[in-house]
Amino acid sequence: MGHSFTGILLGFQLNRIEIYPYGGCSKLEYDINTSLKKEILVLLMGPIIQVVFVETVKHFFIMEPYFYIYHYFILCFNLLPIYPLDGGRLLNLFLAYLFSYYNSMKTVLYISSFLYSSFFLFTLLFTKNIIYIVVVLLLGINLYKEIKQANFYFQKFLTERYLKDYSFKKTKEITELKQMRRDYYHYFITEKEIISEKEKLSLYFSYFF
């Protein structure tokens, strides 16, 4: 609920909430080119609200220990650096401060795939609990979907920059579209001249229309 509430306050549109064994997933509609700080805030409010909820319940009610174990297990699981868990999304956003959108997304998917493979193998070898195995399988399915959608997200990132006018304080000179970063306006260095981001994207999309 923390994600949904914060996202709505920041102007994001809530499409739906999906429930998984490892927690709820708020499907918020917003631009990929939204401020990194805003998106990080939305993601952080999920676990923060969960901790506040559990500690409030602990203060006012007497609950079985299982209640607290379950909630904190879900919290820790959701913070694993595996996309599309909150931990994986946060890792992607922090990488976006260092690298281009394309490279940060590719990197987090590589890291997620490696960690998930190790996690899945560990689960098969040391876990007999069928529910836990199902949870891990569901996570794998969602990760696979994100990997398949990676190129679509990159095209959406470029399309937004072409169709909408964003205001960024930072600028950067680059040579190709895959070097474009979030929170930056770009100038492209060509063999003959330096052209603006809009001009480069106009040339790029002219091949499709």
Predicted regions and their residues:
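Hydrophobic transmembrane alpha-helices and their immediate loop junctions
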Residues: M1-F209
